[in-house]
């Protein structure tokens, strides 16, 4: 009987297989048709990609969702919708500490840029969740020479149309 109780307690301590948190880690808003509130679980269910890049003299393989996929899911004007006044749209990415970076919407759209340019919202580095000081999600821009737009602890993405 004692062994049975120990087994039950051990199984309860281990619990079911680890699941990703369902709390919202990212909000997408602004000039989109479908504002989003995404959890790590939501992001894990989206099409993913890996990019390998140098950061502080270290080569890191990041995995996450292409930023364009998130913008498409939110209904941002991309592809054939990105013309005329919509070309003056930009994406404002904000971190937990208030740090912000801007991307012109056309520079993110594969119809306007080299398809090999993959800007991703990463949630893992070298197969592990991002450290607390970087995550839970961050933007990775592997082709840029400076890391100023590699924004950590991303909380929101806003699509803004200039008047």
Label the model's feature ranges.
Residues 2-12:
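Bacterial N-terminal signal peptides
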């Amino acid at each position: 009987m004692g062994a049975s109780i120990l087994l039950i307690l051990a199984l309860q301590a281990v619990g079911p297989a680890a699941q990703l948190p369902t709390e919202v880690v990212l909000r997408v808003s602004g000039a989109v048709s479908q504002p989003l509130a995404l959890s790590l679980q939501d992001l894990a269910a989206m099409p993913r990609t890996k990019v390998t890049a140098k950061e502080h003299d270290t080569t890191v393989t990041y995995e996450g969702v292409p930023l364009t996929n998130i913008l498409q899911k939110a209904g941002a004007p991309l592809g054939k919708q990105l013309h005329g006044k919509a070309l003056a749209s930009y994406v404002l990415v904000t971190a937990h500490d208030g740090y912000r970076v801007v991307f012109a919407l056309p520079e993110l759209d594969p119809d306007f840029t080299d398809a090999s340019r993959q800007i991703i919202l990463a949630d893992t580095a070298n197969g592990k969740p991002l450290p607390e000081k970087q995550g839970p999600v961050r933007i990775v821009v592997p082709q840029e020479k400076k890391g100023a737009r590699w924004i950590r602890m991303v909380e929101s993405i806003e699509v803004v149309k200039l008047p």
